[in-house]
């Protein structure tokens, strides 16, 4: 994940200048936030679609709105297009097709042209910004229903419109927003009038009889997202806790953040059309029209400034353990030498213990590597080694870049000696970490982690990390305590 605040501000100034020169053109002319329920198609619903008539009526109005904007290209973001955890995949090629055969309606077919000029321009913007997006890893596939359902309605009013199809990723919302900014720059580069189709359902957990059951987070997510989007409160998109979004089982938040980023620095006229969750899944339809420059709405810049101030305050209060881990991360990223500071507490130089270094960025895990028992001659050396590894060698993430350093939240856990336990009742998710072992497989989970609320969750995650089925007989368990340094 890369953010270069000074470069970002310079790019933003250039972007604002170009919009000022062509203020009346408004190259991102508008956007629609829409769901993608296959049942909305009469060929799939066979009458059941009438139960979501509010959504159908709103979709027709949204399609008419798109036609009124007279776009040259639709940029459609879909959570169901093949994507990657750390990369925004842009579909390549000149054409694509698909059908609703998966939903027993093979006769409903779609064929579209991809706007190859726009794809190229967007890839160039991403390359120049060092941003993880492009088509080089794309594996051409048929159109997905996250794209086809919106097209079902839009093509009635705007036939033969070329599209750009973009998959969501597992990257933080700040990166989704930044992608939207790059889409706006690509529209300026190509001189094309763009309408963004932010395809995404809301929560899937709103009815006991629904496909995912009921969870309180479901209707709460819908209430919040509809209010924030209808108010144009795009900065609030960064504030939805990841665990909360996962609990709500939403699939559109990334699409909405990309769309919001495309309007960065611009006023937006908004019209909320509908919301319902008849089948237990939230469907929301909102229209957005670009109303011109508004320098008060640079939400990513504001977010970065606030996050840096928060991290600076935390660093000022950090103890020697966390400061040493941060110094090691910085040295690893900058490929600079690091020597043990002269003022370290004596226990860091004389004691030996296992240590875990955890790195978060914008409240998302960015790296975590540790040792169950001591492998170095001192706790200090253990921290240096594991901080370096967490920043560069965690297989789940790309190595941390220099531009990320101001936004990293780094903590250190020093482990006590593990002790065997005979039953899960001897665990406490807040107090004890757990180690599970079966044969040559071993997994560990630290205590007091966000989103881990039960002993069963703790054991299941530790087993999953080790490739162990929690139901397997003969799993050995140990517990340990930690001292956390921040």
What are these regions (language model features)?
Residues 73-75, 195:
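Structural motif
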Residues 167-221, 359-379:
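Active-site beta-strand/loop microenvironment that shapes enzyme catalytic pockets
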Residues 372-399:
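A short mixed-secondary-structure module that forms the rim of ligand-binding clefts
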């Amino acid at each position: 994940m890369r953010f270069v605040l000074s470069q970002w501000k310079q790019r933003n100034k250039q972007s604002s200048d170009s919009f000022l020169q062509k203020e009346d053109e408004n190259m991102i002319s508008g956007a629609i936030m829409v769901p993608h329920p296959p049942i909305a198609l009469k060929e799939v619903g066979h009458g059941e679609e009438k139960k979501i008539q509010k959504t159908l009526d709103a979709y027709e109005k949204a399609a008419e709105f798109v036609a009124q904007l007279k776009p040259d290209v639709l940029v459609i973001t879909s959570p169901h297009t093949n994507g990657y955890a750390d990369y925004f995949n842009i579909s390549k090629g000149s054409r694509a097709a698909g059908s609703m055969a998966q939903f027993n309606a093979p006769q409903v077919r779609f064929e579209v042209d991809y706007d190859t000029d726009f794809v190229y321009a967007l890839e160039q913007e991403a390359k120049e910004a060092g941003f993880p997006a492009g088509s080089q890893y794309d594996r051409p596939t048929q159109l997905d229903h996250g794209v086809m359902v919106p097209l079902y309605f839009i093509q009635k009013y705007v036939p033969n419109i070329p599209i750009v199809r973009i998959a969501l990723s597992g990257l933080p919302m700040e990166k989704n927003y930044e992608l939207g900014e790059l889409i706006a720059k690509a529209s300026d580069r190509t001189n094309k009038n763009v309408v963004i189709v932010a395809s995404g359902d809301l929560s899937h957990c709103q009815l006991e009889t629904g496909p995912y059951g009921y969870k309180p987070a479901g209707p709460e997510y819908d209430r919040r997202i509809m209010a924030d989007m209808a108010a144009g409160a795009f900065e609030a998109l960064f504030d939805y806790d990841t665990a909360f979004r996962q609990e709500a089982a939403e699939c559109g938040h990334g699409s909405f953040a990309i769309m919001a980023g495309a309007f960065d620095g611009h006023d937006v006229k908004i019209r909320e059309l509908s919301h319902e969750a008849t089948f237990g899944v939230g469907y929301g339809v909102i229209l957005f029209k670009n109303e011109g420059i508004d320098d008060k709405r640079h939400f990513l810049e504001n977010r970065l400034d606030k996050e840096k101030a928060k991290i600076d305050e935390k660093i000022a209060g950090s103890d020697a353990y966390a400061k040493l881990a941060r110094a090691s991360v910085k040295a690893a990223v900058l490929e600079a030498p690091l020597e043990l500071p002269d003022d370290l507490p004596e226990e860091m130089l004389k004691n030996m213990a296992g240590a875990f270094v955890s790195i978060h960025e914008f409240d998302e895990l960015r790296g975590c590597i540790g040792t169950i028992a001591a492998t170095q001659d001192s706790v200090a050396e253990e921290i240096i080694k594991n901080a370096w590894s967490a920043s560069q060698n965690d297989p789940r993430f790309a190595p941390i870049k220099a531009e990320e350093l101001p936004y990293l939240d780094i903590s250190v856990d020093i482990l006590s000696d593990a002790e065997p336990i005979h039953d899960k009742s001897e665990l406490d998710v807040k107090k004890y970490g757990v180690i599970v072992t079966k044969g040559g497989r071993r997994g560990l989970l630290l205590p007091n982690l966000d989103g881990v609320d039960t002993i069963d969750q703790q054991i299941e995650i530790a087993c999953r990390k080790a490739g162990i089925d929690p139901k397997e007989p003969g799993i050995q368990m140990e517990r340990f305590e930690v001292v956390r340094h921040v």
